[in-house]
Structures are given as C-alpha cells and as structure tokens.
C-alpha cells in the first residue's frame, strides 16, 4: 500500500488528472459539488477524454440548489455570472452524457425536509480498482481556492471497498460499513447508522491521554461536547478554524463552546480553510469528508478514515498542522451575546437534524 497526503487543490488535481488519464477500465468520481466554472470544466474535459471504458461522475443534488455558496432559487439568481455558471454546468452534463460518461445527481431534492437535507457529502475517486482518493475537496473554483487536502492510496483491497461504496451510492442505496485495510480504517456512513459509525471516533476522543488537535471550519455539537468532556479530564484541546469562516454561526458556536469547555481556539490567517482532521496524542489521525458537525453525526453520507500509520500522521503534522499552527493567532475565547446566539442557532439546528435522522440501519 502506498499513501500520499496531497495538500492543496492543485497538488491533488495534478495527481488525479494523471490517474484519470491512465485509467483503462473504470474511472469513478463522486463529489458533493460540481460547477461549470474553470475547475469543473477541467474535470469534465479529463473525464470526456479518459480512455476508461466505464466512466462515471456522481454529484449530489446539492449542486442543483447551490452554486458558489449561493442559493440558486433566490435573490442571487439576478446575478448574470451565477446564471451563466449554472447554464455551463448543465451544458457540461449534457456533453459528458453525449460522450458516453455516466452522470447522475444523487439524493434528488424533494419537498419534505428530509429530502432537502439528506445529502451525500462524500468526495471519492477510484481508478481501475487500484487507486483511491478520499478527503474534502470539491470541484468548483471557490473550493479549489480553499486550504484543503486529499489522500491518494494505491491499494487494490481499499479500491475494491471504495468501488463497492461508489456503485451502491450510484444505485441510490448507499452502504454503511467499517473496513480495515493495511492500517487504514475506512468507515462509510450512509446517513442512517451514523451515530454508530462515529463510535470509534468518540471512543478515541474519550481515550485521549494528553492532546486533541482539531482542524475544522464547521466543528459543532455533539463533537464540541465530546471535546469538552476530554478537556475536563485534563486533555489539552486545540481547535484551528479559518479566520474567514463562510458560516458565521458555526464560528460563534465554536467560540461559545470553547469558552464553556476550556479549550483553545486558533485562527488560520490565509483565507478560508476547508480542512477537516483531528489528531489524538499525535498518534491517531482522523480525516475524510466529515466536518465533525451535527449534520455528519445525524444525516449526511460521509467517509471517515482513521489511522496510526506513522508516516502519514507525520506527513499531516509536518505539512498541515505545524505550519498552520505557526501562522495562526490565538482567538480571545470569551462568551458574548453574539457567541451565545450563534450557539443557540447551532443547537437548534442540531436538534432539528436529530429529529430528521432516519431510523438506524445496519452497520457492519
């Protein structure tokens, strides 16, 4: 098994583009958002030109509702640039289908609240039952501009599990499973058994001896409660979030929970960070597509990777955590009217998500 940590969208794309071009049998890509801007066009052209006999692109239907972090059926629709981007996206979908690339929008939108919020947040690519990509990067210009990362893993065994996962999602029947491959624990959450699926992460937090370091823009309840519980045991807890958070209520919630729970908050100064990772005692790395938030905990389809692979943990610490920490500044962690209001808003959202959660399914 060969594992590479790819930091930044360009580093990720350079590797994935080559793997996609070299695929001969299967080329599967799953993403939360796909937009017809320059980044989306790059992916579309690469999939169109790929030699693989079975090429498929699976996009969550979130992309039919949101573009560039703006709601399409709303005031933003008056923006000519947004309308053009939506039309370009539709045009690329038609082109790809015309060139023999399967394109599907998963989890169709519907009028019920469950049909609106139940999304697949996975970011996955699998090529020739050999190479797997997992992580947090979506295919749009603004996502590529964010600070983020992906894993590239060469492993036929992991690729077999990832292919199984992709095909199940493609058929509208996402699976939940927990697999161990070469020191990587690969957990797939299907939006039904998520609380059970997250249990290994919660147990690891509860077993922490001296440190838990989290990078997430959208960290929220109940994970903030788990971190506060660890802090009460004397574990040092640090949360690194972006200086420019595109979801302000979540930033306020993090500050309020930190003020109450006694953990440290630091701000990444380089714009928006979309990183999502946790290290426990600098020995265990948890990463994937989950933001460690209430939507992941209750509703979203996600991937979680847990590993004690020393080379990978060190690569993450050396390439992400340590440099980001060195450039970050400590936030003044204190409760205020603003942080309390943000905290209330997030907790109301978490309660709503809990009520909308589907019955627990099988988790194996």
Regions found by a protein language model. Name each.
Residues 1-2, 328:
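Short, contiguous pre-domain boundary segments
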Residues 2-25, 33-206, 210, 240-283, ...:
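HKD-type phospholipase D/PLD-like phosphodiesterase module
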Residues 12, 158, 223, 312-313:
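Short phosphate-engaging motifs
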Residues 191, 202, 216, 220-224, ...:
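Beta-propeller domains
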Residues 198, 235, 362:
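Catalytic cores of glycan-processing enzymes that make or break glycosidic bonds
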Residues 229-230, 235:
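Helical hairpin unit composed of two closely spaced alpha helices linked by a short loop
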Residues 283-285, 290-364:
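Long, C-terminal catalytic modules of enzymes
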């Amino acid at each position: 098994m060969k594992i590479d940590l790819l930091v930044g969208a360009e580093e990720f794309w350079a590797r994935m583009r080559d793997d996609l071009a070299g695929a001969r049998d299967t080329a599967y890509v799953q993403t939360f958002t796909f937009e017809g801007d320059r980044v989306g066009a790059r992916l579309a052209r690469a999939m169109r030109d790929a030699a693989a006999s079975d090429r498929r692109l699976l996009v969550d239907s979130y992309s039919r509702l949101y573009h560039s972090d703006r709601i399409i059926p709303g005031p933003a629709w008056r923006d000519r640039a947004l309308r053009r981007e939506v039309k370009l996206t539709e045009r690329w979908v038609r082109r790809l289908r015309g060139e023999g690339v399967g394109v599907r929008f998963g989890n169709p939108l519907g009028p019920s609240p469950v049909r609106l919020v139940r999304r697949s947040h996975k970011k996955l690519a699998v090529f020739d039952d050999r190479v797997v990509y997992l992580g947090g990067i979506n295919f749009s210009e603004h996502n590529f501009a964010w600070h983020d990362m992906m894993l590239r893993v060469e492993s036929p065994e992991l690729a077999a599990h990832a292919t199984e996962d992709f095909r199940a999602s493609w058929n509208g029947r996402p699976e939940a499973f927990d697999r161990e491959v070469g020191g990587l624990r690969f957990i797939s959450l299907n939006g039904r058994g998520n609380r059970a699926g997250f249990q290994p992460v919660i147990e690891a937090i509860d077993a922490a001896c001296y440190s838990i370091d989290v990078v997430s823009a959208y960290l929220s309840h109940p994970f903030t409660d788990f971190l506060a519980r660890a802090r009460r045991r004397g574990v040092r807890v640090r949360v690194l979030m972006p200086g420019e958070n595109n979801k302000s209520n979540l930033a306020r919630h993090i500050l309020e929970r930190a003020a109450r729970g006694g953990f440290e908050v630091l701000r990444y100064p380089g714009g928006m960070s979309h990183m999502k990772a946790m290290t426990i005692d600098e020995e265990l790395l948890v990463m994937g597509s989950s933001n460690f938030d209430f939507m992941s905990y209750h509703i979203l389809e996600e991937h979680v990777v847990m590993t004690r692979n020393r080379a990978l943990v060190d690569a993450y610490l050396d390439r992400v955590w340590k440099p980001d920490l060195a450039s970050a500044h400590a936030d003044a962690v204190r409760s205020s009217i603003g942080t309390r209001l943000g905290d209330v808003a997030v907790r109301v959202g978490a309660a709503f998500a809990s009520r909308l959660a589907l019955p627990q399914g099988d988790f194996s």
